Curated annotation (Swiss-Prot):
Gene Ontology terms: biological process: mRNA catabolic process
Gene that this sequence comes from: rppH
Motif (Nudix box): 38-59
Named cofactor requirement(s): a divalent metal cation
Record-given protein name: RNA pyrophosphohydrolase
Length: 176
């Protein structure tokens, strides 16, 4: 489903823990990392798509998370010309995204990247809040900056009220 301007409706998901860190996921078989995201199906609300993508990509359900916030507006990014599929009609030139900030209320062990026959990710880790803005692929950077800026006050207040962890594991491989 591509809109009249060539953008595909999509949801993005920022998952934070009680310390205000965010989940950073490694794309399957690649060296690139990003937040979970995915398309909105016809007839599906942004929130419904978010819960579907949450389960498909990281194996979490509604009971594992709490919605803390969502972006006020749709945020857009254009794909680099080399990634646009010009032979597919209608042509998709980018994504327009509704973002959700979720708090993991379950356990790290509930995260499972292997719920789909074609997994999006093969590993993940908790990172500091602003880390993804510097690390995501360049064409998504402006959207990430805007999302993180919009969600910052909610996440920081959560982190201020949480006990500090003793130690944090660096990286987790897929489970399955």
């Amino acid at each position: 489903m591509i809109d009249d301007d060539g953008y595909r409706p999509n949801v993005g998901i920022v998952i934070c823990n009680r310390q205000g860190q965010v989940m950073w996921a490694r794309r399957y078989g690649q060296h690139s990392w990003q937040f979970p995201q995915g398309g909105i199906n016809p007839g599906e609300s942004a929130e419904q798509a978010m819960y579907r993508e949450l389960f498909e990509e990281v194996g979490l359900s509604r009971k594992d998370v709490r919605i803390l916030a969502s972006t006020r507006n749709w945020l857009r990014y254009k794909l680099p010309k080399r990634l646009v599929r010009w032979d597919t009609k209608p042509v998709c030139i980018g994504q327009k995204q509704k973002w959700f900030l979720l708090q993991l209320i379950g356990n790290d062990a509930d995260i499972n990247m292997q719920t789909s026959s074609t997994p999006e990710f093969d590993g993940w880790r908790w990172v500091s809040y602003w880390y993804p803005v510097r690390q995501v692929v360049s064409f998504k950077r402006d959207v990430y900056r805007r999302v993180m800026k919009e969600f910052a006050s909610v996440t920081m207040s959560l982190a201020e009220s949480a006990p500090k962890p003793q130690s944090a594991p660096a990286y987790r491989r897929k489970r399955g």
